[in-house]
Swiss-Prot record:
Disulfide bond annotation, renumbered to this chain: none
InterPro entries xref list: AAA+_ATPase (IPR003593), ABC_carbohydrate_import_ATPase (IPR050107), ABC_transporter-like_ATP-bd (IPR003439), ABC_transporter-like_CS (IPR017871), P-loop_NTPase (IPR027417)
Family: Belongs to the ABC transporter superfamily. Ribose importer (TC 3.A.1.2.1) family.
This protein's record includes keyword Lyase: no
Domain of life: Bacteria
Keyword flag ATP-binding: yes
Catalysed reactions, as listed in the record: D-ribose(out) + ATP + H2O = D-ribose(in) + ADP + phosphate + H(+)
PROSITE patterns: ABC_TRANSPORTER_1 (PS00211), ABC_TRANSPORTER_2 (PS50893), RBSA (PS51254)
Protein name according to UniProt: Ribose import ATP-binding protein RbsA
Subcellular location: Cell inner membrane
Keyword vocabulary terms for this entry: ATP-binding, Cell inner membrane, Cell membrane, Membrane, Nucleotide-binding, Repeat, Sugar transport, Translocase, Transport
Organism: Cereibacter sphaeroides (strain ATCC 17023 / DSM 158 / JCM 6121 / CCUG 31486 / LMG 2827 / NBRC 12203 / NCIMB 8253 / ATH 2.4.1.) (Rhodobacter sphaeroides)
Length: 502
């Protein structure tokens, strides 16, 4: 029998004139963790939907655990041992762990449920595979995000899964939870289970995967081993150009200081923080989890109040009692969790873009729909927002396009200061380049940009200067030749405070 758990060969799929897959291959060996990467639109989702039995391919051959299959349905795929762990947590909050594990596969004695047996079996599975003691009567809503992910995986293992497909499984996890999940996946690999790991996080791909299939324009363009191929080389395969071209060059001159922060403090979070951002400048700020960076951002936008210090915008001291006052002061915040706080996913693209600036489109006390539509269409063109029309619900857009909608909202407000919290998180490489280009254009027009990111390569490659926060205080300023990811990491980890100038 072949050593392949999944063998998809020559898979093609078209939707009318659009070719989503063109002679694509995906081969995954048993007992390996196999990465699947590519930009949005590269074909990742389509080939996984074919594997899941959701889409029927136009041509190609599929073999699962040595069995050639002519047609697939979601039910038949599960019977063949292939299970999917989706990015969204599809668990009932009021269910117990045991109920979530055995939903639709309940243990019975004749017509009667066996809740005690299900509880014991769920606890045994979690203990055996993950080394955790998790009571089976715990409610799902009381679990951490990582524990909920474990319950999803346990549900698959209860049905004797031989292949697990995980779609962006770390998107909502903190680093400690990511480390725990990776330990779980490595343990499953040791048990002979094949894992397909889909992620935009290249560092995770490098740390976890044995092999990686890279997709571009609907086909696979190579299978590489992370230990033998660098992240930059993988990204270059994804975007068909050198990774150095990701970050646009800025040639415009910097203007006068727009944002000046002096002696800002908040008990328990940060103290005596001072910096300035000039017109046309992108200032990076980074720090480890718990460093105080998030709380600093909240104070700048009026979500929290500092205990001491001042914020000056264009020479005027401002104190924002709430986010509404910050918006009036022409300060914009694009939050890390865009789906929860950056955009209203059940509203249209148009309504999201204009919600904070409707007064600009008022005529005699009423919103001029024509003026609003004209402005929105302009933003859609300017930002290359991929949407069929302005009335499309934002939830139907990709992550990168949702982020562009969030940025367009503040462009509509004609903001002066942009505070961006992890603006490229869970965004594919192509969309990242588009976001960098947009921010570069904003800077060239005189905006002051505060760019928060935990991706140190991104900070080093995109920003003019960078500040590092360590345990609530600034522990280094870096610019020019010294703006280096290794130096940033050292400062973020508490290395001796230093100040580096260009």
């Amino acid at each position: 029998m072949s050593g392949l758990a999944i063998d998809m060969t020559g898979i093609s799929k078209a939707f009318g004139p659009v070719k989503a897959l063109v002679d694509a291959d995906l081969r995954v060996a048993r007992g390996t963790i196999h990465g699947l990467v590519g930009q949005n639109g590269a074909g990742k989702s389509t080939i996984i939907k074919v594997l899941a039995g959701i889409l029927k391919p136009d041509s190609g051959r599929i073999t699962i655990n040595g069995t050639r299959v002519e047609s697939l349905t979601p039910a038949s795929v599960e019977r063949l041992g292939v299970h999917f762990i989706h990015q969204e947590r599809l668990l009932v909050p009021t269910a117990t762990v045991a109920e979530a594990v055995f939903l639709n596969y309940e243990l019975r004695f004749g017509p009667f449920l066996r809740p005690g047996a299900m509880k014991r079996r769920a606890e045994e599975l979690i203990r055996t595979h993950f080394g955790l003691e998790l009571p089976g009567d715990t409610l799902v809503r009381d679990l951490t995000t990582a524990q909920q992910k474990i319950v999803q995986i346990t549900r698959a293992l209860a049905q004797e899964a031989q292949v697990l497909v995980l779609d962006e499984p770390t998107a909502a996890l903190v680093k400690r939870e990511v480390d725990s999940l990776f330990a779980v996946l490595r343990n499953l690999r040791a048990q002979g289970i094949a894992v397909i790991f889909i992620s935009h996080y290249m560092q995770e791909i490098e740390d976890l995967c044995d092999e990686v299939t890279v997709m571009r324009n609907g086909t696979d363009v190579g299978v590489v081993r992370p230990g033998e191929t660098s992240i930059d080389e993988i990204v270059s395969m994804m975007i068909a150009r050198d990774v150095g071209e990701m970050f646009p060059c800025r040639s415009h001159a910097l203007g006068a200081p727009v944002l000046r922060v002096e002696g800002l403090s908040q008990a328990g979070h940060f103290r005596n923080v001072s910096f300035e951002v000039r017109a046309g400048e992108v200032l990076g700020i980074t720090g480890l989890l718990g460093s105080g960076v998030k709380e600093l951002v909240e104070c700048l936008f009026g979500l929290e109040q500092p205990d001491a210090g001042s914020v000056t915008i264009d020479g005027e001291v401002r104190r924002f009692a709430n986010p509404g006052r910050a918006v009036q002061g022409r300060v914009a915040l694009v939050p890390e969790d865009r789906r929860a706080h950056g955009v209203a996913t059940d509203m249209s693209v148009r309504d999201n873009i204009t919600i904070a600036s409707l007064e600009r489109y008022m005529t005699r006390g009423f919103v001029s729909r024509a003026r609003e539509n004209e402005a929105v269409d302009g933003f859609i063109r300017e930002l290359s927002i991929k949407t069929p029309h302005r009335d499309q619900l934002v939830r139907n857009l990709s992550g990168g396009n949702q982020q562009k909608v969030a940025l367009a909202k503040w462009l509509s407000c004609q903001s002066r200061v942009y505070v961006l919290d992890e603006p490229t998180v869970a965004v594919d490489v192509g969309a990242k380049v588009e976001i960098y280009t947009l921010l570069n254009r904003l800077a060239a027009e005189g905006a002051a940009i505060l760019f928060l990111s935990s991706d140190l390569l991104e900070i080093a490659g995109f920003c003019d200067r960078a500040l590092v926060v360590y345990r609530g205080t600034l522990n280094g300023e870096f610019a020019g030749e010294t703006l280096d990811s290794d130096l940033l990491l050292a400062a973020a980890s508490g290395a001796r405070a230093q100040r580096k100038e260009a």
